[in-house]
Amino acid sequence: MSAALQQAALGLAAGEVPIGSVVEADGKIIARAFWRLRDGLLAHPELVALQASNRRDVTLITTLEPCLLCMAAAMFAFARRVVYALESPTDGGTRIEDFWNPAAGSVAPYRFPEVVGGVERARSRQLVAEFLERHPDAPLARWAETLV
């Protein structure tokens, strides 16, 4: 999680909402990203890191609970595990597991990854609070307020 938090801090330094992600395989970080809203609404760090890793059986480590889009991406990338720091009450996607029920005998290869939440929650929340102090009128400030 420390590497994901470092990515989030880089995002904060760049004036972005501090969300960072890394992808780990075989105990090594193979991809990393932080949110760059200026790169587009879909440039979520989870998506960017998963795409850059281009591997199966990875662990996605992120400072914010992945949204539905990012959880689906983790499933489609065959991530084995998702670890996150801070819950996202308005759009967190890890609860999709409660509804994910592939049809019996389905040939769909996608499986819901193991999910671990709350790792370094306080540090991630602190970074979001720092962002709000520095950028109270940022485009996503109102949403970011739901995280602290």
Q: Residue spans of the language-model regions?
A:
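Short HxH-centered metal-ligating active-site micro-motif
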Residues: 42-76
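Zinc-dependent deaminase
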Residues: 1-11, 73-148
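Active-site metal-coordination segments of metallo-dependent hydrolases
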Residues: 1, 38-43
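Short beta-strand scaffold segments in enzyme catalytic cores
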Residues: 19-27
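Small-residue (primarily alanine) positions within well-ordered alpha-helices
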Residues: 4, 8-11, 21, 31, ...
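Short beta->alpha transition motifs characteristic of CBS
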Residues: 30-37, 114
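Short, flexible loop/turn motifs enriched in small residues
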Residues: 14-18
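A structural signal for isolated positions on well-ordered beta-strands in alpha/beta enzyme cores
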Residues: 22, 59-61, 81-83
